[in-house]
Amino acid sequence: MKVPALKLTGIALGMMLSAGAMATNPGTPGGEQPGTGFPAVSDFAASGPFSTTNSNVNTTCAVYRPRTLGENGLRHPIILWGNGTGGSPSTYGRLLEHWASHGFVVAAARTSNAGSGEEMISCLNYLVTENGRSTGTFDGKLDVNRVATAGHSQGGGGSIMAGQDSRVTVTAPFQPYTLGLGHRSSSQSNQSGPMFLMTGGSDTIASPSLNARPVYNRANVPVFWGELRGAGHFEPVGNAGGYRGPSTAWLRYHLMEDSNAEGLFYGSNCGLCSDRNWDVNRKGIN
């Protein structure tokens, strides 16, 4: 199925349509230091403690990262990012910088057609190689056993495709488009780790019922499906609006062992479960 080009090629214009100003971003309930040694934070939606930088490391990947890597022996988890159709890493630059400020190394595929997930895995291969070198920016400073895939729209579908790689720990697709554009439905039942499936209650481009519901039903892994009420398709553009805090919490919990983030998703009275801005379905998550 082909999506009308007028809807998907103008993602950058969606910043004007974002409902982010109306959405809440839950903070952490406490300040216990994550098990991996990264600093605790008091608000997942606020910038983290690391100063950041970004650059195009090759023709296929842009990397957003803490300016100084490996301080105090830290090994930084990896997030692979896929853009929506017509978008680029800079389209989502404030979100990617936000994650980098929390200590993640974010490798964004430099393609506007990320639906196959191939370019995202290419970025992972690059970082794994660089981490194994004896010298260089990334030498021995990355935790290649803690890897997430994330992306928006076509890139969200791509993040599910890339989520089949056995090196992937967890996924976080934003409003994934899963009806074509490189996406294969067989990937949905072949995931390597838990998924935070994010949709928008007012999304008319990647309709949750057509694009996300089948993913939720087919997934072979635990899924937290959170639908942000009132969010249109372009909410993730820029700083990701109401998705920023929860997505950061999900990644910190699974990649940094940040127990402060656990309560947003897990437990009988999880934070997002009782948040009036979110509609939640959980599968294999208690």
PLM region spans:
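Short amphipathic alpha-helix adjacent to the substrate-entry channel of hydrolases
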Residues: 90-109
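Short beta-strand element of the alpha/beta-hydrolase
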Residues: 73-84
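The feature captures the conserved acid-bearing segment of alpha/beta-hydrolase catalytic domains
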Residues: 169-239
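Bacterial N-terminal signal peptides that target proteins for export
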Residues: 1-10
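Alpha/beta-hydrolase-fold serine-hydrolase catalytic core, especially in secreted/extracellular enzymes
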Residues: 229-230, 237-286
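Gly/Ser-rich "nucleophile elbow"/oxyanion-hole loop immediately N-terminal to the catalytic nucleophile
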Residues: 68-75, 118-157
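Short conserved active-site loop signatures built around small residues
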Residues: 24-74, 166
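N-terminal signal peptide c-region/cleavage motif recognized by signal peptidases
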Residues: 18-19
